[in-house]
Amino acid sequence: MKKNPSKNEKEINHIAIIMDGNGRWASSRGLPRYEGHLEGLKTLRKLIRDLKDFKLNYLTLFTFSIDNWKRPKEETFRLMQLLRKFISNDLSELHNNNVRVKIIGTRTNIPKDLIDLIKGAEKLTLNNTGLYLQIAFNYSGRHEIINAAKKIAVSAVNGELDPNKIDSNIFESNLYSAGVPDPDLIVRTGSEKRISNFLLWQLSYSEVYFEECLWPDFNKSKLDEAIKDFMLRSRRFGNIINEFG
């Protein structure tokens, strides 16, 4: 069941994370890139467990971009294996902790057995009311927007929707993330300062925090630092606030 977003701008309801730096972490240690991804999975597993100490309702993770198909076939195969590993090994614990799992993105090019695992995870946790874990896999912000536009266009052509009544609410209801509030905070690890085609519609008023450490080195204290930084910011949402009292 969807929770209402917080009305208090100083509370964090939804954090989205670009988990960058696995490959560089491995390379700096003379290890194959896949070892970095495995270490990154350990970091993710521990962070999700640590979230019980934070008042957070939604967590979105950017795990695999559509653009990642440009990487060597062996690496993309191993990244598919990583999601299999996560669902197979961690789903029971997530379900027991009342976590709802939702995987967003296109299913194109994803092996059928992995699609079946994804569907099973979503079905099993559908009625869970704890943390909403949204995993962006085979995802692109531009693709999400184009897909939503196509769905709306089809509805309009079929006479199911008056084009003059199309607004942001209708558009958002056709996104992969329909029903999930926009992120309050975007965290990117790995020192790069870009958003890499992630949640392009949803992050219009999100605060962005760039963390220098590589994803496998990210931990609870690093997340706490990001949240503390967020708390010091003034979120105007296009408005004017009194900064002097």
Give, region by region, the residue ranges found by the protein language model:
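Flexible, compositionally biased loop and terminal segments
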Residues: M1-G245
